Amino acid sequence: MDNSYNLNEQSSWNGISSEKKKNYLASEDHGQKILSVLQSFREQNVFYDFKIIMKEEIIPCHRCVLAACSDFFRAMFEVNMKERDDGSVTITNLSSKAVKAFLDYAYTGKTRITDDNVEMFFQLSSFLQVSFLSKACSDFLIKSISLVNCLHLLSLSDSYGSAQLFSHTLYFVQHHFHLLYKSSDFLEMNFGVLQKCLESDELNVPEEEMVLKAVLTWIKYNLESRQKHLPHLITKVRLHQLSEDTLQDYLLNEEYLLKSTNCFDIIVDAIKCVQGSSGLFPDARPSTTEKYIFIHKTEENGENQYTFCYNIKTDSWKILPQSHLIDLPGSSLSSYGEKIFLTGGCKGKCCRRIRLHIAQSYHDATDQTWCYCPAKNEFFCVSAMKTPRTMHTSVMALNRLFVIGGKTRGSQDIKSLLDVESYNPLSREWTSVSPLPRGIYYPEASACQNIIYVLGSEVEIADAFNPSLDCFFKYNATTDQWSELVAEFGQFFHATLIKAVPVNCTLYICDLSTYKVYSFCPDTCVWKGEGSFECAGFNAGAIGIEDKIYILGGDYAPDEITDEVQVYHSSRSEWEEVSPMPRALTEFYCQVIQFNKYRDPWYSNHF
C-alpha cells in the first residue's frame, strides 16, 4: 500500500502568485518488494555477482543480499580481502544444506526452525554472524531445556557464544546438579563450564561433599589431561563446610592423587579450619543448609528466658533448651555463620524496655562480646570491643560483624557514639573503621551485600517519646566510606516503630504504626510503597529471608501481647499468616540462622 500527501507552497513573482506542488511518496512494502525481486533474480539465475564454494557444489548469489543479512559477509566486502576481489569464498565447515537454508532465509526473511534443524541453524548463524537467526535459535532451545539435553545445550551455547542460552542452561544445570553429575554428558563437560557451575552459591546439592565427589569423578575420567586442573577446581569446593571425618577419609582414600597434584595440603588446611573455626563460615550453599528464625527474650527480672526457633521449610516452632545467654539490657544480637554474637549492653540494673532504658541516669555499658554455639549449646566470651557501648546495632557484612552507634559508659546526657567497629570471627580481632557522619539514636541496620544501611533518629527523647525517623546513612564496607542519604520517605515515620530488613539485596522497612511496607531504590533514593499487612504490634520483630519478610509478635497495649506471625511475599506482594510463636512476646531478639544439614542441632523428624 502506497501512502502519499501533497504539500502546496505559494510564492509570488512580479506580484503574480504562483503555486508550487510537491508530492512525497512512502511505500510501506517497499523493502518486501525489493526482497521479492531479488528472490526472483535468484530463481531466474540472473545478476549473480558472487559464489560460495562448497565441497559438493558452487552456489551463486548476490553480494548485497549476503552483506545485508550477515555481518560475516559485510565485513568481508568492506575490507580489502582476497574473497572480495575474487568474487567467491570457500566454506568448508558448513554443509551445502546449511548454506542453502541460510540463503533461503536471506532472500525471503522466512524460515522454519524445528528440533531437527535448530542446531544446523544455530551453527551457521554463529559462523555467519546472523544475529536475528541466532537469537531465534537461542529462544527455541531455551524452551526445550530438559534433564536429557541441558548439558549438551550448555556445551553448544558455550561453543557458539550464545550468552542468553548459556545463562539459561547454566542456571538449569546448577539447579539440577545433584541429578546430573553422574551422567556421561557431565564427564564430557569442559573445564571452564564446570568451573562456572562450582562457583555458584545456587549449585543445588544436598551436601558439599557431592561437589568434591563431582570434581574427582570429572578429573579421573581423563586423568592424564585433567589432573592439572585439580588444584584450581578443588578451591571451588567449600571444603570447610565438610566434616573433619569426611575430609580425613579423602586424605586416606585419595592420597596418591592429592599428593601428585599438590592438593594434599589444601585438604590438611581445610581440616585445620574445621577444627578451629567450625560453624564460622557463612558461605554454605543454601541447598546444603536448614534455615531458622531464632527468637530469644529475657524478662525484666533477668531470670525468666524464652528461646525458640522457627523452621522456614516446615512452618514449625520448637522450644529450645535453656541456653543461659547473657543478653544485658541494651545489648545487640547478630548471627554469623552457625553462631550467634551478643555485644555490649549495660551491666547495671537498667530496665530492659527501651522506653525506660534510655531514661536511666547512668549507663554502665560494657565492651564484652559473647558467642553462642547452638550446635554445642555453649556460651562463651570472645575478644572485647574497643569501646563499651549499649543501645547500639550490629550487622554482618563481608564476613565481618559491625557494631554501630549506641552510647558508651556514662551519664544519660552523653552523646551517641560515632565510633564504628568491625569484628573478624576467624582472627578474633576488632578493628576500628570510619566513624558515622553524625550521631544517631535507635539505629536500625541492614546489610545488602557490601552496603550497610543505617536508619534512626537524630534526637534521643521527644515530647511524645517517639522521635522521628530522620537519619539515613549508607556505608560501603568495601571502601570503608559513609555517606548520608536524603530520607525521602514521603511521609512521617517514628524511629522506634519501623523495622529495616534486607530481602534479595533490597532494603525494606516495615512501619508498625501504619502496617505498610516500603522498598528503597538506591538509584533514586526514593521509597516505594509495596503494600500493607493486616496488623502488627509495637516492638514486633521483623526478619527478611529469601524473598519473604516475617513480622513476629509485638504488643498492642502493655497487657495485650501477641504471638502472631505474618509473612510478606515480596515476589507477589501478598501477605499470609503462618504458625504462631509458642509464646506471645514483645521486645525480643530475632535473627535468621542457618546450619549445615549434618550439623543442624535443631533437626527433628517431628519438628
From Swiss-Prot:
Domain of life of the native organism: Eukaryota
CDD domains for this protein: BACK_KBTBD3 (cd18480), BTB_POZ_KBTBD3_BKLHD3 (cd18271)
All residue ranges annotated as the BTB domain in the record: 48-115
Kelch repeats: 291-337, 339-390, 400-450, 452-502, 548-595
Gene3D superfamilies: 1.25.40.420, Kelch-type beta propeller (2.120.10.80), Potassium Channel Kv1.1, Chain A (3.30.710.10)
One Pfam short name: BACK
Span of domain BACK: 150-250
Keywords: Kelch repeat, Repeat
Name the record gives this protein: Kelch repeat and BTB domain-containing protein 3
